[in-house]
Amino acid sequence: DRAGTEIRLNKQFDWAGHHWVIPAVYSCSKGLVVDFCMRAEAEDIRRFIAKWNLTAENDSAENFTQEQQMQMELENPLDLDFSAKIKLNGKTLQSSHGCAVGIIPCLPDGVANEKVAQAAAAHYGLDDSYGWMIYRESYPWGRKRRPEIKSLSLAMEQQPCHVPGPHFKTHAPGDSFSFSHPVSGTEYTLTVQELEEQAISQQQFDSNRWCYPTHFTAMSYTISPEPDDDISICDCAEGDRPLEIAPCADSYAPEARNGIVCVGVIGGTVGPAAVVFGKNAQGHLHAVCSALHFEPVAEDIEWRIEFHVVQFPRKTFLLI
């Protein structure tokens, strides 16, 4: 395909705690391409790097717990999960795919930003004293012919972010735990209905190379009052790492890591019947599974409550 026609806009607005620039859109044969530039203060980036001691040797997710990673995502001034719908001539267009690059103004000596990020920042004349995330999203026309752009608006919407909540342990059915929502302040009580040790067949992993952990604890529970879909429960512990039982000749094959859980197996081809509980009709029954281990866990599982929170309201901006 030929390069799209650049339409310079230089539209600027403030949303979700950031200053944004929409420098240009590109009218292509199959759709519209939009570049979103989200600005971050250099000092905020420095504080974030210092707080988490991020260095070239200490920037891997494996160096941090799941809860630390969640907190880092919340605090990272260059991280915001959002969706953007385009309304073109009154018709809504959905993004089909996208990509992103970042500019960090306070990198240590000897470390440089990606060349493609530098080129994009230079092309748009972005102030290099700030940090920037440059998102590029593609919006198919939804028709065979490229339309003439008469009006163009943008609806920005934050995706729910994961906020770590309190921990609790359960020993037996009937145990309960009370907690409050960090945004609404609503008080909830979680009550355990069933708590069982279970195991998955090794055959369900369908692997000749790896031996996977198969033991887990399954818990069903109710929450009162019944919440929206913005509360979930997860195991605080990491799962056991799979063991390699046969070598792999492919040097590019993926490497097994920690944090194995049984959700994918239970919700996959074997179906949710892999978790079996007795009948219970009191309230809406929820279910959660612990991380996988090679041996049954003797101690009580420590669970974490997670909240899925939208911090900023949806907002529409006129581009053309």
Residues covered by each model-derived region:
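Alpha-helical, hydrophobic structural elements that either
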Residues: 1-320
